[in-house]
């Protein structure tokens, strides 16, 4: 199982939100690329980077900060937030991103995502409130169940699905294993758990399930609840 340290970008700074509320943003670093170097030193292989401003605006906002992060280490980077057309996919891959996350567009234009997955390394991001897909930086909730959307990409060739339980995100209340397994089983695609990881026991529960391909760790690290060096030793 892979562990993805998370860097969420708002106005070029690394922040964490609670339940996706931009007003709750807490700044953890004014130089996100330095965080990337720290994670690399701990033994990370991947980074999970989100342009929060981009997710809400529907367009790329923190491109320069993302480029600095990518150029500062040898880590593989998956990037999401406001990527809704082929030009933006190519732009991120051209600066060295390893794969791109398509979120809102997966609900609104699933055929576009399938086409892109044939050409580029694409990850689908599915964010859910009470089991239903949320889009536009989590500001809107649809009538489609997350598992139903996941099933649409079972044979699309996407590299992974990231599933986030919004109610858990940034709350340090424990990961939603049942939801993660529901997505993994509905899609048959490598599934990455996101939202609510509180400590090492959560990571081990996901690993021990044998059905989860990865986990994203954000606030639990920034608030000192998880020793990432130890986590990488135990899991990778």
Curated annotation (Swiss-Prot):
It is found in: Cytoplasm. Its main location: cytoplasm. The keyword Amino-acid biosynthesis applies. Pathway: Amino-acid biosynthesis; L-histidine biosynthesis; L-histidine from 5-phospho-alpha-D-ribose 1-diphosphate: step 4/9. One of its GO terms (biological process) is L-tryptophan biosynthetic process. Belongs to the HisA/HisF family. NCBIfam families: 1-(5-phosphoribosyl)-5-[(5-phosphoribosylamino)methylideneamino]imidazole-4-carboxamide isomerase. This is 1-(5-phosphoribosyl)-5-[(5-phosphoribosylamino)methylideneamino] imidazole-4-carboxamide isomerase. The gene is hisA.
């Amino acid at each position: 199982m892979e562990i993805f340290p998370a860097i969420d970008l708002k106005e070029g700074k690394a922040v964490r939100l609670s339940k996706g509320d931009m007003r709750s943003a807490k700044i953890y670093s004014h130089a996100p690329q330095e965080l990337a170097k720290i994670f690399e030193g701990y033994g990370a292989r991947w980074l999970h980077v989100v342009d929060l401003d981009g997710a809400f605006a529907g367009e790329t906002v923190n491109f320069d900060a993302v480029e600095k992060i990518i150029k500062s280490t040898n880590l593989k980077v998956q990037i999401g937030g406001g990527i809704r057309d082929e030009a933006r996919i190519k732009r991120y891959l051209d600066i060295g991103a390893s794969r791109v996350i398509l979120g809102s567009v997966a609900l609104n234009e699933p055929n576009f995502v399938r086409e892109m997955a044939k050409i580029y390394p694409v990850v689908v991001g599915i964010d859910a409130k009470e089991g239903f897909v949320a889009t536009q930086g989590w500001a809107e909730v649809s009538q489609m169940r997350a598992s139903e959307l996941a099933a649409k990409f079972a044979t699309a060739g996407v590299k992974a699905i990231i599933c986030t339980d919004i109610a858990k995100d940034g709350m340090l209340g424990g990961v939603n294993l049942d939801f993660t397994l529901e997505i993994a089983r509905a899609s048959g695609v490598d599934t990455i758990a996101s939202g609510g990881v509180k400590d090492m026991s959560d990571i081990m529960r996901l690993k021990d399930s044998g059905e989860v391909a990865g986990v994203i760790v954000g606030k639990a690290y920034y608030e000192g609840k998880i020793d990432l060096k130890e986590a990488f030793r135990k899991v990778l």
